[in-house]
Amino acid sequence: MRVVKREPAVLLVEDEPLLGELMTEALTDKGFQVHAAPDARDALRHLLSGADIDIMFTDIDLGEGMDGATLAQLAHEMRPMLPIIYASGRRSMHEIATVPGSTFLPKPYTLKEVDATIARYLGNDRA
């Protein structure tokens, strides 16, 4: 029997459509499966569906409704081992209640920084 290894999956939570599309394309080009969510509610649906998700990358300021920090707290309760990367251009890490095992990327970030951060969590050499 042959075991097929799947590509690592990223749950990308970004409310800015253009940035979400660019990040989805960039991560897909790097060989990741991307589950894109425009808001916290949609991200929670992905998590509750049982989808294979290896890491969550979320904006903090998600517009209307739940913010990324609250989403991360809920995600951590559902999946305590899920690594979480926060991103924000308006807040600093000190203003955000982060969950254990998470990290913060200030906007603007580069794709190289995103790659390196994901690779650090997933233990692969994609950066």
Located regions from the model:
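Non-catalytic signal-transmission and effector/linker regions of two-component phosphorelay proteins
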Residues: 1-12, 17, 30, 41, ...
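Charged docking surfaces used in two-component/phosphorelay signaling
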Residues: 21-29
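Acidic, metal-coordinating helix/loop segments flanking the phosphotransfer/catalytic sites
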Residues: 36-55
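Active-site residues of response regulator receiver
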Residues: 59-60
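The feature encodes the CheY-like receiver
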Residues: 63-65
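Short amphipathic alpha-helix used as the core "switch/output" element in two-component signaling
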Residues: 67-82
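Hydrophobic/aromatic residues positioned on beta-strands within the core alpha/beta folds
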Residues: 85-87
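Negatively charged, flexible loop motifs adjacent to catalytic sites
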Residues: 89-93
